[in-house]
Swiss-Prot record:
Belongs to the intron maturase 2 family. MatK subfamily. The keyword Membrane does not apply. The gene is matK. It comes from Beta vulgaris (Sugar beet). HAMAP family: MatK. GO terms for biological process: mRNA processing; RNA splicing; tRNA processing. GO terms for cellular component: chloroplast. Usually encoded in the trnK tRNA gene intron. Probably assists in splicing its own and other chloroplast group II introns. The keyword Cell membrane does not apply. It is found in: Plastid, Chloroplast. Pfam families: Intron_maturas2, MatK_N. One of its GO terms (molecular function) is RNA binding. This is Maturase K. InterPro entries: Domain_X (IPR024937), Maturase_MatK (IPR002866), Maturase_MatK_N (IPR024942).
Length: 505
């Protein structure tokens, strides 16, 4: 983000949030090439990684003309331009990639300024998704019910633009965005969740991910405030509070009402405070309250989506579960609150007593069946979990094959290091090790047994994490201390995303 600040002049148009002129700047496309998710669009050919300034100059020249967005049929049928057969598709992808970089600028600057104001130096630690689990472990032991929520996708692309317009006041940029969204889909039709996911995978991922993430963050900014002020919204019609334009003025009015109503303040302390956590399109809302209270929260959220974002969600997308007897499928773990009972014998003179203590423990379990399904889909094993050779990797060198398998195994071990039961993880490691051995033996046309015998223990070391290597050198395998360290849960602050095998849907 510091690179942007060095290139962008803070002139009058920038101060008034006019971002449209930036689409004509060459350095924007250079940043899009460096940071974009689809880097191939700015390459002169598929085998060359050199950034093509010539393509960008042609694009900017064409956009500066009166008919910059009109491409004739002959343009699409011309010869290849730097490896791309369709010039219209190439230009569209380049513009949307650059536009995605532009709309990210103000929000990145807001993030940097907020972190500097709070004197937070190592902000990357706050991005670790593993930091959620210590929070759940600390809070969930004292809670009763949880709402398992699937955040609905917007039913129309115009909703995304309408949400963005309250922050981005440049009308030209919004019209520009509408134009390209119209190119992707008929503007007058609705979209389903499956079609929206298809957009994210097949189209400009950076732009659509930004629009969806901004849509979710805007929903959360309103919902979290209303959740915090839920004590005095019971006697107030919340439908009138959700108009976004005058929302901040209504916040001041609500605070004034709150300070003047002592009866409502007394009721506030009786209301169990819910805890809210989200990752991607799934969120959870947990509370110490009763089932009736969670039922009210469920329909409150549904009406909240309808009134404020024109999103109609079915009640079956929100589940009410009791933490004591349900596992929560969240971020690749099965999490639950388990009751451990311990019986203590107490002797008092001639009488003895049995005292049963119940201790709550937060369990995080590796979901073995979904993981095996993901491995089967990736052709590492069959549907029953029996390892098979990865035939598409058989043409690689031995070191590349071992490195690829070992990297997947280490990444999964790293992510699931916080699991309270690691036996399932050992099975996943076994599948990957044997699949690697089968791939190598297939390449060299030998048996798996003879190949493993020839490689020896050096082959298995590639599948160990750094922590396991250190422990194996310091402590013997059969010691109780070593076994206790292997079983201990460890949460890391350097994990910012879920492995694709964990998050495969």
């Amino acid at each position: 983000m510091e690179e942007f600040q060095g290139h962008i002049e803070l002139d009058r148009s920038w101060q008034h949030n006019f971002f449209y002129p930036l689409i004509f700047q060459e350095y924007i496309y250079a940043f899009a090439y460096d940071h974009g998710l689809n880097k191939s669009i700015l390459l002169e050919n598929s085998g060359d990684k050199k950034y093509s300034l010539l393509i960008v100059k042609r694009l900017i020249t064409r956009m500066s003309q009166q008919n910059h967005l009109i491409l004739s049929a002959n343009d699409s049928n011309q010869n290849e331009i730097f490896g791309h057969k369709n010039k219209k598709k190439l230009y569209s992808e380049m513009i949307t990639e650059g536009f995605a970089v532009i709309v990210e600028i103000p929000f990145s600057l807001l993030l940097i300024s907020s972190l500097e104001g709070k004197e937070i130096v190592k902000s990357h630690n706050l991005r670790s998704i593993h930091s959620i689990f210590p929070f759940l472990e600390d809070k969930f032991l004292h809670l009763n019910y949880v709402l398992d929520i699937l955040i609905p996708y917007p039913a129309h692309l115009e909703i995304l633009v309408q949400t963005l317009r309250y922050w981005l006041k440049d009308a030209s940029s919004l019209h520009f965005l509408r134009f390209f969204l119209y190119e992707y889909r008929n503007w007058n039709s609705l979209i389903t969740q499956k079609e929206f996911i298809s957009f994210l995978k097949k189209r400009n991922q950076r732009l659509f991910l930004f629009l969806y993430n901004f849509h979710v963050c805007e929903y959360e900014s309103l919902f979290v405030f209303l959740r915090n002020q839920s004590s005095y919204l019971r006697s107030t019609s919340f439908g009138a509070l959700l108009e976004r334009i005058h929302f901040y003025g209504k916040i001041k009015y609500l605070v004034k009402v709150f300070t003047n109503d002592l009866g409502v303040i007394q009721w506030f302390f009786k209301e169990p405070f819910p805890h809210y956590v989200r990752y991607q399109g799934k969120s959870i809302l947990a509370s110490k309250g009763t089932f009736f209270l969670m039922h009210k929260w469920k329909y409150y959220i549904i009406y909240f989506w309808q009134c404020n974002f024109s999103v109609w969600s079915q009640p079956r997308k929100i589940y009410i579960n009791r933490l004591s007897n349900h596992s929560l499928d969240f971020m690749g773990f099965f999490s639950s609150v388990r009751l451990n009972s311990s019986v203590i014998r107490s002797q008092l003179l001639e009488n003895s007593f049995l005292i049963e203590n119940i201790i709550k423990k937060f369990d995080t379990i590796v979901p073995i069946i979904p993981l095996v399904g993901s491995l089967a889909k990736a052709k590492f094993c069959n549907v029953l979990g029996h390892p098979v050779s990865k035939s598409v990797w058989a043409d690689l060198s031995d070191s590349d094959i071992i490195d690829r398998f070992g990297r997947i195994c280490r990444n999964l071990s790293h992510y699931y290091s916080g699991s309270s039961r690691k036996k399932s993880l050992y099975r996943i490691k076994y599948i990957l090790r044997l699949s690697c051995a089968r791939t190598l033996s297939r390449k060299h046309k030998s048996t798996v047994r003879s190949f493993l015998k020839r490689l020896g223990s050096e082959f298995l070391e590639e599948f160990f994490t750094e922590e396991e290597k250190v422990l194996s050198l310091i402590l013997p395998r059969d010691s109780s201390t070593s076994w206790g360290l292997y079983k201990r849960r460890i949460w890391y602050l350097d994990i910012i995303c879920i492995h694709k095998l964990v998050n495969d849907e």
